[in-house]
Amino acid sequence: MPTLLGIHGTVTSPGRLHHAVQMAVDAASASNLEITTNLLHLGDHQISFADGRPAEAYADDTAKVLEQVTSADMYIIATPIFRASFTGALKNLLDHIPVEGLMGKACGLIGMGATDHHYLTVDTQLRPVLAWFGVHLVPGQVYLQSQHFQDGKLVDAKAIGGLQELGRAVVALNAATGSCTSGPAPLASG
């Protein structure tokens, strides 16, 4: 059975963004009952700073988290936007992952920021990093703001619809591409 991993790309306590990525993961699961889903919250794990060691050389949760990430078949990655970029915690996780760990896998993206000024951050910061890994990316993204929520719950119909469509699109993209890579491996992986 294929596995979809939702990644809550921050160490802050689960809240609105966690709720949103769970909604997208649930929609993916509902679109194909044969997939297994999991949600990884980076704040639940002690992940060392990437320093070039092999994963098994770390004494904390690093190797376990890397195994969970690289063994998944598809992803929905959510990140808050801080200072016009995705989180350092997510960047650190990506720094640990070998290219072949993500290559040829489907992925959808969710960003959340305080204002609409940071909407393009996911496209200009995170998308190029994942493209370098050879990830098959759903063309659009979901961008959320505080006004989409009320009492911590997502209430904006357009945002809810976008998350549901993103979940379904990741499953469809995974089915369409299988394990097909999107081109040659990056120079650094050779």
Where are these regions (language model features)?
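Short acidic capping loops at alpha-helix termini that bridge into adjacent secondary structure
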Residues: 35, 104-105
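Polytopic transmembrane helical bundles with strong interfacial aromatic enrichment
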Residues: 152-153
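Short, glycine-/small-residue-rich phosphate/pyrophosphate-handling segment
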Residues: 107-145, 161
